[in-house]
Amino acid sequence: MERDPAAALPQVICLGEALVDRLGPPGGDPTTAPPEQLDDRLGGAPANVACGLARLGTPVAFVGRLGRDAIGEAFARLLAERGVNLSAVQWDGERPTRIVLVRRSAAGERRFEGFAGEALVAGHGGGGGARFADQALAARELEMALPPLLAGARWLQIGSIPLASAASAQALEQALALAQGCGVAVALDVNWRPTFWDAAADPDAAPGHVTLTRLRPLLERARLLKLAAEEAEGLFGSRDPVAIAASLPQRPSVVVTDGAAGVAWWFGAGSSGSGVACPAVLPAFEVPVVDSTGAGDGFLAGLLHCLCAEPALLADAPPWRQRAAIRFACACGALVCQGSGAIDPQPRLAAVEAFLDAHP
């Protein structure tokens, strides 16, 4: 019998956005495609990670704000069915749950194109999607709801999107302060999405100076920092995990994912097994890709699952143990790529183990 992740205090708290990814037809435009060619999938990076952890059997909580609408209710049902702790979820009766338009290439790669219903919220409160429920996360509600969850937690998993509006940025700061007071480490997946900051932004734009200034304090509080390769270039001018760690005062563990090119990481001087400061690298698994949406979130869920099971991985674990954890995380991401959407294809522990056995 599988254990219920919600039956114990969460080891990971995932804080941030829950939304719908509206996937356009492969090679088509989600803004103009007819409804029958669109594929709506529940998503949002922290919600994806929470669902992935629960699927693997790690006790986890999701903290976010949902619109009191059909999408929000569907999300609450899904999270509850997965066994995610929802005791700190907030509900918004004024703002809708966000729908993100996702353009897919014929090869399954995705590009974020803005938001459905953007005209309804444009011009209200400063940044792209500032009137959606996820951007109105309330610090006052967190002050009461979060401490009981932190009592048994090892990790607070966050992204940068809450910084895009004043209310959710304040709530994020509150969560970070509470986590620090409880000795809970921060896992930051930057998840840079320009259109969440400015609906008119180029989806491929790098962070500007003002945004970098706002991101820097967040980067400096991470114990574990996960970046896509293009995010690493945009934020640090390098894809080298060692160089990235050295540029931050706390010297975090750093993982840089690069799609089909694989993963590079640095968990300390012993990561490579050479005794010197150089990153370790693992090639990606070769799998048929249906949709890459959520692959990075599946990877992070797999890695946090391993870190909860073996807390010393980022400290003094031998290189082969660190590599095994990264390989497990890569398998989680590869399995997500073989289905549609970020959450539905997430694997159970037995499926990951079977995949690894089949890919020695």
Predicted feature descriptions by range:
Residues 98, 160-164, 333, 339-342:
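Glycine-rich phosphate/pyrophosphate-binding beta-alpha loops
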Residues 7, 28-30, 130, 136-145, ...:
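Intrinsically disordered, low-complexity terminal tails and inter-domain linkers enriched
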Residues 20, 24, 68, 192, ...:
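Short, glycine/acidic-enriched loop or turn micro-motifs at the edges of active sites
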Residues 1-13, 177-181, 239-360:
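Conserved phosphate-binding/catalytic region of the ribokinase-like
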Residues 155-243, 253, 261-263, 268-270:
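Conserved beta-alpha-beta core of the PfkB/ribokinase-like small-molecule kinase fold
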Residues 1-85, 111-112:
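Glycine-rich phosphate/adenosyl-contacting loop at the front of the ribokinase-like
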Residues 59-158, 353-360:
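Conserved N-terminal subdomain of the carbohydrate kinase-like
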Residues 148-149, 217-218, 247:
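Structural alpha-helical scaffold elements that stabilize or flank donor/cofactor-binding regions
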